[in-house]
Amino acid sequence: MGEALKYSIMDSVRSVVFKESENLEGSCTKIEGYDFNKGVNYAELIKSMVSTGFQASNLGDAIAIVNQMLDWRLSHELPTEDCSEEERDVAYRESVTCKIFLGFTSNLVSSGVRDTVRYLVQHRMVDVVVTTAGGIEEDLIKCLAPTYKGDFSLPGASLRSKGLNRIGNLLVPNDNYCKFENWIIPVFDQMYEEQINEKVLWTPSKVIARLGKEINDETSYLYWAYKNRIPVFCPGLTDGSLGDMLYFHSFKKGDPDNPDLNPGLVIDIVGDIRAMNGEAVHAGLRKTGMIILGGGLPKHHVCNANMMRNGADFAVFINTAQEFDGSDSGARPDEAVSWGKIRGGAKTVKVHCDATIAFPILVAETFAAKSKEFSQIRCQV
């Protein structure tokens, strides 16, 4: 091989290996972690996540997006030509905030995240809540009896013989559900009487509000939702112990052989889909934000409602599901954009993390950090 050819090959190889880079200085965050030589400062440690990389950065982005939800005011937008005089008023525009939808699965209420949810609802930091049947019943049951820490590896057959139910590494004594039945059946009795005598048409959200009223316990997020008039939607109300109780009650008050004559307690789901979609449709001038923990029913129900207004403006998903099986749980925000459930220019992120880890940290750096602002009544348009 001649010298000229050798150098030509080397130049060609070097040009490939050492390809000239685009300059990222100033346009991208530099990756660096927290310096513990500065001592232990948890606020600074959390702030450093955005520059740490991987899911730490996604959590940092989620914190930033939620803070954008909380900071947004209509005054940040220019008035449209057709807006009313009231809508042009500076004070009015400053009072209009982002409408926040919070969705979560039942296991998070089984866990200590229930107390984080209760804090948000207690202080009116969210506007609409969507959960599963377990997310309703577990909140109520915890007012009657505790859930305990167990272990993921405890054998099911042994636990069954002891009357202990396992949720991951949590243990729920079966007696808790007996206490739940003793508490809730008389409430259903009263609701049935109101249905017959006062022609009350119950929807899942009305049932949930009533249960929040009856439990009358400040540790319950449903109690605070009732007190603060925050709607809690659960289209799958029958899927869980709550459904078991409704099933038992249907034999007590209804006539299984003649359901057309006496169906027992009736719950109208159509009324709630109108109410839920209306929360998005009638958001009016407000932007909407979605914070969704876990997947499945709550995730889709919140996203689908926001489709009715051409998509949410902010979205934070926190779950460990993957998109490769085509599940809604695993779908990234961009898939929701294709359906019109999230707007094309929306601020979005998915944090691939157990919500029991990520969500309390997120709340600490967002809602809780701005708690004084929530002492004032948030605008309801």
Curated annotation (Swiss-Prot):
User: Which EC class is the enzyme in?
Assistant: transferase
- Residues annotated as catalytic: K341 (nucleophile)
Reaction(s) this enzyme catalyzes, per UniProt:
[eIF5A protein]-L-lysine + spermidine = [eIF5A protein]-deoxyhypusine + propane-1,3-diamine
Gene3D superfamilies per the UniProt record, alphabetical:
Deoxyhypusine synthase
The record's section on NCBIfam families has: dhys
Described function: Catalyzes the NAD-dependent oxidative cleavage of spermidine and the subsequent transfer of the butylamine moiety of spermidine to the epsilon-amino group of a specific lysine residue of the eIF-5A precursor protein to form the intermediate deoxyhypusine residue. Also able to produce homospermidine from putrescine.
State what protein this is by name.
Deoxyhypusine synthase
Species, as recorded: Solanum lycopersicum (Tomato)
